[in-house]
Amino acid sequence: RELLPDLWSSLFMVVPTVSTTFASVRTMFGDLPPESIGWLLVDEAGQAVPQAAVGAIMRAKRSIVVGDPLQIPPVVSLPEKLNVEICKFFDIDQSEWSAPAASTQTLADQASRFKSTFVMDVGDREVGLPLLVHRRCQNPMFDVSNSIAYAKQMVHAVGPKRPGSIGSALGRSRWVDINGDAETKWCPDEGEAVVRMLKELAASGITNPDVFIITPFKIVEQNMRRRLDSETNLLRALGVKLDEWCRDRVGTIHTFQGREADTVILLLGAPKASQLRARQWAASPPNIINVAVSRAKQNLY
């Protein structure tokens, strides 16, 4: 065990970077003493519960923590009531130290010597070193994200707009108003609208379209996949394998964190007035809509 730091140092001379997950840190580096690794780079830190990063950060001399607290928050399996009671027992501020309100990224922002402030509509938000230059999305996706999540402080640095073959077939990014009815959050009329859009792509001769179909709700994902199961000829015309394409291209917003596509079809679901709370949940705080919208590079429907 005494030789482990030297063995890892020898490996790092050959392979400068080793990739792992927080869950595997104990297995890979459990016997290393504190501050025995030179640099720790944490990606997607906004999704990590604070305690997950402790072991890795403890073993590093320096850490760079990169993430966005305004995208997908950490997933917490602990019941909310139990979480609240634990925080009360230990006399800690739940919003500051406990997920999902807190993440590895929010604590890194607090610890940073360098800070910046976002002036929000409701209170201000302090972050460490914000990455304000945005290089993925064209408008209107950039404007939506910039307005709802970043207090219009981001800088748009994307090249000329290229709607591509999908944009030419479906037209400009827009809201598709479906006055449908539903017994659950799944609205069959919205699903039919998605199928019609895919048929327009097939009619235009487009194959293997770079499209994500994203929804906030699991039941909508499941029913959209079932609906596409009956469109084998359509998927064949699009030049894709049904099961593989649905698995990779149709899903909830959590499925697409960190990914991007030419075009996103945002399938909202929950169309009835009595389901308004479900849509409000999907839009406030802005994390979920921010992630969905910012997956699209060129077109959003």
Feature map (PLM): residue ranges:
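Conserved helicase motor
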Residues: 22-27, 215-219, 249-256
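Short glycine-/polar-rich loops that comprise or flank the Walker A/P-loop
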Residues: 36-37, 59-62, 123-128, 170-173, ...
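Conserved RecA-like P-loop NTPase helicase motor core
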Residues: 73, 244-301
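Structural motif
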Residues: 18, 41, 64-66, 214, ...
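ASCE P-loop NTPase helicase motor core
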Residues: 3-149
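Active-site glycine-centered loops adjacent to acidic/histidine catalytic or metal-binding residues
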Residues: 68, 213, 258
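Short mixed-charge
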Residues: 96, 116, 230-247
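Conserved helicase/translocase motor-coupling segment
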Residues: 146-232
